Each structure stands twice: as structure tokens, then as C-alpha cells.
Amino acid sequence: MLTCVPGVLEKDDVADFRRIMDAAEWEDGRSTAGAQSALVKRNEQLPPDGDLARTLGNRIISALTANPRFISAAIPLQIFPPLFNRYVASDGHHFGVHVDNAVRGDRMTGLRIRTDLSVTLFLSEPDDYDGGDLVVEDNYGSHEVKLPAGDLVLYPASSLHLVTPVTRGTRVASFFWLQSMVRDDHARSMIFDLDTAIQSLVERLGRDDPETVKLTGIYHNLIRYWAEV
């Protein structure tokens, strides 16, 4: 399931992020890549253990925990500290096809997660750069994603994916992973669809409508059946 979540960060927050990040020191993005990914990764990152990345990452996590659509789609158990990258056209940056590591560990906190979902939060407007599309492959084909700044996309971390070469401008984003309470993507997708339908019914019929209450009970029982906490 590939899901877009609009407006995770307000435009003023994005501008503040960019002001801070544009003045920062960046390093070779291959420093956090696995052996296979390092062969096809050409970009830059903020030092992942630096105070700047941690401070900005905490702001993102705060925004995520207040976003109902993100919570509904991801059902997060653990969120890996967000990382930050940029792709600069003049440096020929791109990221060839790869799959993310199944387990990620954070050196500073000792946190280890199973990477159920990969997340990209866009921090550049689509008009600011050419190329730089996130391309995610699944059983239904390839999906090209290029969202407004402040929006994010969630997709299964098991997916093959790539970032096409940036040919003009600079693409800046945050990327990270999370472990969901519901491991199976198909089950998580069904729960998300059910929750979306329930919220629509609540708007039309009210939260105390008997059928809405019944469906809400089914939702929680499915979570209870599948959740690993």
C-alpha cells in the first residue's frame, strides 16, 4: 500500500527547516547505506548523529503523532529517527534501484526496528527541481511520486525503489522507517480502508450511530487480532 499524507508540515515550518538546512554541513550519503545500496547511492545527508538532524527529526515526529491520517495508515509502534538528504543537479545525484534493509539500528539510542514502512517527507517544492522522482515498484507496476513540500509518502519497505537523477535544482527531503503494530501490509491496508470508511460515516451519521459503533468495534478487534506490541 502506497499512501500519501498531505500537510504533515506547514509551509512556515518547511521554510524554517530549509533555512536551517541550507546553512548546514552535509556529508556523503553513502555513510548510512548498506553494502548493496552504497553501489547506487549518490546524494548528500546531514550527519545522522548530529544535533541538527536530531532536533529537526524530533519536530517531524511531533508532527507525525498529531496527524490522524498518518496514524491511521501506519499504525506506528516505533519510528526511526528521521534522516535528511539532498540531491543536487550539478553533482549528478541520484539513487539507483534498491531495497531498504530489513532491520535498522540507531547508534545513539540503541533503538532497533523492523522496517515495515519507508517514509519520504518532501522539503522541496516540485517546481524547484527537475527529475528526482521517487519511483516505487509493487505488484501493480511502478509509481512515480513527487509531492509538495510538507507532504509525505508511506510505502512498504520491502519495495524496490529508486530516485531518478536530478537534472535541475536541488531536491531536499527527510526519509526514515517505522515498525508498525501490524506487520502484514495487506492487513494494515484493510484496516486503513476500514478506518477511512468509519470516519466518513461519522461525518454523515454521527459518532453515536449504532452501525458506526459496530464498525468501530470491528476495527478495534482487528487491531487486537493483528497487533504486535
UniProtKB/Swiss-Prot annotation:
Listed PROSITE patterns: FE2OG_OXY (PS51471)
InterPro entries, A to Z: Oxoglu/Fe-dep_dioxygenase_dom, PKHD_C, PKHD_hydroxylase, Pro_4_hyd_alph, Pro_4_hyd_alph_FE2OG_OXY
Record-annotated Fe2OG dioxygenase domain positions: 78-180
Binding annotation for 2-oxoglutarate: 171
Gene Ontology MF term list: 2-oxoglutarate-dependent dioxygenase activity; iron ion binding; L-ascorbic acid binding
Cofactor: Fe(2+); L-ascorbate
Residues at which Fe cation binds: 98, 100, 161
SUPFAM superfamilies in UniProt: Clavaminate synthase-like
GO biological process, one term: DNA damage response
Keywords: Dioxygenase, Iron, Metal-binding, Oxidoreductase, Vitamin C
EC number(s) per entry: 1.14.11.-
NCBIfam families tied to this protein: PRK05467.1-2, PRK05467.1-3, PRK05467.1-4
Protein name, UniProt field: PKHD-type hydroxylase Nham_1514
Species this protein is from: Nitrobacter hamburgensis (strain DSM 10229 / NCIMB 13809 / X14)
